[in-house]
Regions:
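N-terminal signal-anchor transmembrane alpha helix of single-pass membrane proteins
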Residues: 1-29
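Extended beta-solenoid/beta-helix repeat architectures
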Residues: 23-226
Length: 226
């Protein structure tokens, strides 16, 4: 019995030593630290967060493309046109307030040229802005949406049908069409500081068109040949 107890104590001692021994350096450093300060550790290499440029040449077909600087088509982007003096747009009769700074239009809406629209618009029909002009807010149209040449939209663009953006148009926010999206030369969507998404069933691009962000053609997208 005594021998069994002795061997048990010996086995327990050896096991305890083997378990504690790996922690001795840490315990010794804790009791009498030799490092006066924490050792510097080299930081991991920073990720490349800079803009990534990509160009789709005329004749290219695509579905989903991501890039901070996406050029669709070839040739130089035309210089931004100088907008004329704009007149403050007035909502038509029957328009209802929508949100904090918007209007709900229950029928088709045509916006004349040289207009400043300082609000968001919800149109239960077709919307057409003749351009040039500036719209400071989001736009949502049910049937179709057409921005004429030189129209600047500071907001997002939504349509349950087709969208046309004529030459020189710019949209600072995202663009979403449940139908087709037609982009004319000189169109700019998004900004380098604020990449956005462009989405439609079908995209018809006549470049050069510049998009900051991503484009998604659910069925097909194509860049027309020059």
């Amino acid at each position: 019995m005594n021998d069994l107890l002795l061997w048990s104590l010996l086995l327990l001692t050896v096991t305890t030593v083997l378990l504690v021994l790996p922690f001795y350096p840490a315990w010794s450093e804790w009791r009498r630290p030799r490092d006066r300060q924490a050792q510097a550790v080299d930081p991991p290499a920073a990720l490349d967060t800079g803009p990534r440029a990509l160009q789709l040449a005329p004749g290219a077909c695509f579905n989903t493309v991501h890039a901070r600087h996406l050029m669709l088509g070839s040739g130089a982007m035309p210089a931004p046109s100088v907008q004329p003096t704009l007149q403050r747009w007035q909502p038509p009769a029957g328009a209802r307030p929508w949100g904090l700074h918007g209007w709900h239009i229950g029928h088709h809406l045509d916006i004349p040229a040289n207009q400043l629209v300082p609000c968001s618009l919800v149109v239960r029909g077709r919307l057409r802005a003749l351009g040039p002009g500036r719209i400071e807010g989001d736009i949502k149209a049910r049937d179709s949406l057409h921005l004429g040449p030189g129209t600047k939209l500071q907001g997002n663009l939504f349509c349950e049908g087709d969208i046309w953006l004529d030459a020189g148009c710019s949209v600072s926010g995202l663009v979403m069409a449940e139908g087709s999206l037609h982009l004319a030369p000189g169109v700019v969507i998004g900004t380098p500081q604020h990449p956005v998404s462009v989405c439609a069933d079908v995209m018809d691009v006549r470049g050069p068109v510049l998009v900051h962000g991503s484009v998604q053609a659910r069925i097909r997208g194509s860049v027309a040949c020059a």
